[in-house]
């Protein structure tokens, strides 16, 4: 799961056991802090208070650029709905773009590790274009290996065989989540990203999931922000915004935390 720990945060006993095991790992690896980002709502006061009671520091309302993940996700409720019902709910322009990609001959399928080189090239281009660090090929190999049939690498190719879009998605519990995405700087007029999302949504439907999770929507309330386009794209699939509680820190060593925080801030690194 993209967020964790994966447990019932209403259960204080379970949370206590997680902390005790985390302390053992922290001692073994000389860790100074545990950061968690559980899948609990921002208004789940009971869970938030349980974590605070156990000693977690709640990082409420910190700037969005300073968090590891977005606090808000965009999700699509697909429970007990057919493909036709879901497709017809999309914005008309989004339906048009999906059909356009098909008409233009875009191929969208899921693959194994044999297409990771193509995906990593797209990630390089996307990271350079949008200004974010990217994972290594080895990381993505481990991702696919760890989740086995519950992870899929989707790739879109143009009619001339060029890789133009790719995504890694994972199925767990009652949902499918779009975890990593990348696209080419060329042939964007073929609208591959729309078709790729539709194929991943169809996998969620086939898997009888309740939710398709588009994941983060950074700065979704700031229309003039450079990241607002992420929300605009996902919004066309007619889902809804969910807001999570955010990050909590458990400090194992106050001295180490103070020193390391100071050093990281001094070099301009803010995601602590």
Residue ranges and their predicted role:
Residues 17-27, 141-146, 150-253, 258:
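Aromatic (often tryptophan-rich) hydrophobic motifs at membrane interfaces
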Residues 24, 38-189:
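A conserved beta-strand-loop-helix scaffold within acyl/acetyltransferase catalytic domains
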Residues 12-13, 41, 45-46, 219-226:
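Short, flexible/disordered intra-domain loops and linkers
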Residues 8-15, 87, 133, 190, ...:
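Flexible, glycine- and charge-enriched loops at secondary-structure boundaries
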Residues 2-12, 79-81, 181-190, 218:
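A short, internal acetyl-CoA/4′-phosphopantetheine-binding micro-motif in the GNAT/acyltransferase core
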Residues 251-272:
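Membrane-proximal basic amphipathic "stem/tether" segments
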Residues 30-39:
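Divalent metal-dependent hydrolysis catalytic cores, especially in the metallo-beta-lactamase
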